[in-house]
Amino acid sequence: MQESLTLQPIKLINGTLNLPGSKSVSNRALLLAALSEGKTRLTNLLDSDDVRHMLTALAALGVEYHLSSDRTVCEITGLGGAFTASQPLELFLGNAGTAMRPLAAALCLTDGDIVLTGEPRMKERPIGHLVDALRQGGAKIDYLEQENYPPLRLHGGFQGGEISVDGSVSSQFLTALLMTAPLAAQDTQISIQGDLVSKPYIDITLHMMKAFGIEVRNENYQRFFVAGRQQYRSPGDYLVEGDASSASYFLAAAAIKGGVVRVTGVGRNSVQGDIRFADVLERMGAIVRWGEDYIECERGELHAIDMDMNHIPDAAMTIATAALFAQGGTTTLRNIYNWRVKETDRLAAMAIELRKVGAEVEEGNDYIRITPPAKLKAAEIGTYNDHRMAMCFSLVALSDTPVTILDPKCTAKTFPDYFEQLARLSELA
């Protein structure tokens, strides 16, 4: 019997939430700190499955670190250069793309015999574009099961040089190459083929590399130049921003049934592109206020929108369920093909589950159209082992209809106490 959680109708949502650390920033920071010269103290680190997988892998690679009892402060002693692996290793990375992709690249700097594997879903998430790019730079990589997918066997060999990478599926491939290139023997020039998706995530990478002492020349997101034979330097203390994707559920909830909700840990100067989610809520009719380290949202009458969501693919999922509460017809979210290669095929999953609560849905190859029903229906929502599906569909409870979330613990990937925090800010009908 699958575990489930039934959320009763919520009449008001109000209060302040201190956001858990960003998954994207946490795993990048751990890797950069491990490769750096010196000790780094990371604060507000996310405690979640994906981060635990990265920490376990780093420990297996000989990185020494100390975690606080609540696992949000981590002191890491950097290696001062690339990993070394004296004996064969197998690293299990769960379903953590933010560990699999960057480690696949970084471990190509070391001669060894390292296998990267993960959960069944990880073996369905494409990595061929990254492998092709690494091979152009001299890396020796074998597919152990299916061509273009993990598990991978790495034998080092990456030297840098001229590389082209397809940018149309995942920005994590480019992030992985950028973070590895400074430690290569040669300078690296990376040319992007196709349209680069999720550009703001590349900005996070570049911003963080700079914090760890490395400059990258970015030519309009078409070409990137990175000098080789460099060294990352620890910034000493590094504060991990709150997770802007996690903020989206609470900001949307306030837009639908506020009160006022304030999320702290992100603000107008955040490095994360997903803060732009608040602009989308504002376009729909919510009232949004920005501070240095907070975003606040207040209820407004929400209207349907038609928008390109390529810049905020993760947070855009929250708009899909917020659309159930929009007046004036059909909401269209465009240019979201990369939903299909995430924790699950999110486009297909979203369409199936939105129909269960009564919405009329058109699912395109790279878009979704959502027309809300006059009244939402109570339903059991499948979550596909995808943390964002569980959190998105919790918003259905902001109607006068309860909703049942199957496998609610899947939020542990990024937000283990999500449902407790939602309950804390909620007043039930």
From Swiss-Prot:
Pathway: Metabolic intermediate biosynthesis; chorismate biosynthesis; chorismate from D-erythrose 4-phosphate and phosphoenolpyruvate: step 6/7. Belongs to the EPSP synthase family. The lineage of its organism: Bacteria, Pseudomonadati, Pseudomonadota, Gammaproteobacteria, Enterobacterales. GO terms for cellular component: cytoplasm. Phosphoenolpyruvate binds at residues 23, 97, 125, 172, 346, 388, 413. The active site is at residue 314. It holds the Pfam family EPSP_synthase. Monomer. GO terms for molecular function: 3-phosphoshikimate 1-carboxyvinyltransferase activity. GO terms for biological process: amino acid biosynthetic process; aromatic amino acid family biosynthetic process; chorismate biosynthetic process. It is found in: Cytoplasm. Keywords: Amino-acid biosynthesis, Aromatic amino acid biosynthesis, Cytoplasm, Transferase. Its EC number is 2.5.1.19. InterPro entries: Enolpyruvate_Tfrase_dom, Enolpyruvate_Tfrase_sf, EPSP_synthase, EPSP_synthase_CS, RNA3'P_cycl/enolpyr_Trfase_a/b. It catalyses: 3-phosphoshikimate + phosphoenolpyruvate = 5-O-(1-carboxyvinyl)-3-phosphoshikimate + phosphate. 3-phosphoshikimate binds at residues 23-24, 28, 170-172, 198, 314, 338, 342. This is 3-phosphoshikimate 1-carboxyvinyltransferase. Its main location: cytoplasm. The gene is aroA. Catalyzes the transfer of the enolpyruvyl moiety of phosphoenolpyruvate (PEP) to the 5-hydroxyl of shikimate-3-phosphate (S3P) to produce enolpyruvyl shikimate-3-phosphate and inorganic phosphate.
